[in-house]
Amino acid sequence: MTKFIFVTGGVVSGLGKGITSASIGLLMKARGYKTTNIKIDPYINYDAGTMNPYQHGEVFVLDDGGEVDLDLGNYERFLDTSLTFDHNITTGKVYSTVIEKERRGEYLGATVQVIPHITDEIKRRIREIARNYDIVVVEIGGTVGDIESMPFLEAARQMQLEEGRENVAFVHVTYVPKLRVVGEQKTKPTQHSVKELRSLGIQPDAIVARSEDPLEEGARKKISLFTNVPEEAVISAYDVEDTYEVPLLLEREGLGKYLVKRLGLEDREPDLREWEKMVAKYKALQDSVEIAIVGKYVKLTDSYLSIKEALKHASVSNEVKVKIRWIEAEDIEEHGTKLLEGVDGIIVPGGFGARGAEGKIMTIRYARENDIPFLGICFGFQLTVVEFARNVLGMKGAHSTEIDPQTPYPVVDLMPEQRNLDKLGGTMRLGAYPVKIKKGTLAYELYKKDLVYERHRHRWEVNPDYIEAFEKAGLVFSGIAGDDERRMEILELPDKRYFIATQFHPEFKSRPMKPAPVFHGLVKAAKEYKQEKDATH
């Protein structure tokens, strides 16, 4: 019998429900239970693919090409697993299916309503995934009281009724503010939030109280009394230095043990040794390197969440802390490359459109000419080709046709299969594709194999007509698409310390104990470069 743990949020959004859900998943998996995580996003978009990163943070891409909420990235990293597009349930998907069924006449003339038709479809989607697992953690996005999340909370309430109380638990994440004026933690927002949840027919089994400092005993007692939750199940989730500490904190607070007991499961000793080792290693790092990320969404660093995490993973494997210098690409256009002075490594990440493109090209030139360890990703890969064409091959005005359709040298062009599309949603080259790696190259040294699967999200590619000219000038295409030999995937400059760019997004497959090879290589090169600089000064 599958067990379900629903995670809801109250008071304010952005409390870390995603990290809490991922941590619960990890604590169950560490006990030997086959566990997975589902994210419910109550917005009406079908998926996260066409959303602005400023509003929503990064769009995370799965193996099957699903463009999903960044929380699924956290689930994959914490549980070291690969999820599917079905693990992200949105209002858009649910309504689409119900309307299609209604058009096909599957409801036999019934009046189609939120209850039972929408709620049944939500439950069907959750159960569909649950079939292969012992425990399913379901995070319901948004805040209790939001009009959008009502049908999902109702479906969760019904599931507890249908599956039996012993098979469904509710964890409510709330915020306990501390008012500086009075210097005490305030539990009233939590009380009201739980009251709201109970008015919808849901009694939480555990409360994860987010606060800056550990929860005071008085506050814990008060929350327990007013929310009808046992004291042992009022969990203090105070701020920690790093999100990877959260599972260990929740375990120390007794959440794993409590949930297993609440669901009538055998409480096995959780095996968190590897995780503890990784966290201890990360916290103990003394030396640091500084890596610049030059992008167009740096005002909201969550737009590059997986890159931040991949650098963290690589910092553990290289035993050196990575400090990130965030630089707006347009600032480079305005103030020049002096903004990059002193960095030990440079990343130009993905991103669409003309804004900041010239700043990124200036950055790539600076990295190449000054031999600074460099990694270009997706659009960063394409602009590396543009920079090389302009400044090494002398192709004045070379560009990507995405930015300049009239360029005399279209060194980056729309992929042939992308030419006549009228829809933007879900139509790119998305998901995991095979990449063949040439032996004797930096890429082969990093991956140590000649065939890898990496995740993609792009419409443009290196124009095959120019490949020969690039190669003659010393640019090495060390990775090509396994499904189309004319499609370039990895480029490198062998005469540089570390200069590599990928058409795919290596950050999406990076894991705490298995850093993405190109990130590991970048941090290693940055560390060596810094040591060289320090030795000469």
From Swiss-Prot:
Residue runs in coiled coils: none
InterPro entries: Class_I_gatase-like (IPR029062), CTP_synthase (IPR004468), CTP_synthase_N (IPR017456), GATASE (IPR017926), GATase1_CTP_Synthase (IPR033828), P-loop_NTPase (IPR027417)
Any one GO MF annotation of this record: metal ion binding
Regulation: Allosterically activated by GTP, when glutamine is the substrate; GTP has no effect on the reaction when ammonia is the substrate. The allosteric effector GTP functions by stabilizing the protein conformation that binds the tetrahedral intermediate(s) formed during glutamine hydrolysis. Inhibited by the product CTP, via allosteric rather than competitive inhibition.
Binding site for UTP: 13, 186-191, 222
Binding-site residues, ATP: 14-19, 71
UniProt keyword annotations, A-Z: ATP-binding, Glutamine amidotransferase, Ligase, Magnesium, Metal-binding, Nucleotide-binding, Pyrimidine biosynthesis
UniProt-listed Enzyme Commission number(s): 6.3.4.2
Class of this enzyme: ligase
Domain Glutamine amidotransferase type-1: 290-532
Top-rank taxon, per record: Archaea
GO BP annotations listed: 'de novo' CTP biosynthetic process; pyrimidine nucleobase biosynthetic process
Pathway(s): Pyrimidine metabolism; CTP biosynthesis via de novo pathway; CTP from UDP: step 2/2
Region (Amidoligase domain) location: 1-265
Residues at the active site: 378, 505, 507
SUPFAM superfamilies listed in its UniProt record: Class I glutamine amidotransferase-like, P-loop containing nucleoside triphosphate hydrolases
Family the entry assigns: Belongs to the CTP synthase family.
Subunit structure, interactors included: Homotetramer.
Note: CTPSs have evolved a hybrid strategy for distinguishing between UTP and CTP. The overlapping regions of the product feedback inhibitory and substrate sites recognize a common feature in both compounds, the triphosphate moiety. To differentiate isosteric substrate and product pyrimidine rings, an additional pocket far from the expected kinase/ligase catalytic site, specifically recognizes the cytosine and ribose portions of the product inhibitor.
Name of protein: CTP synthase
The species this protein was found in: Pyrococcus abyssi (strain GE5 / Orsay)
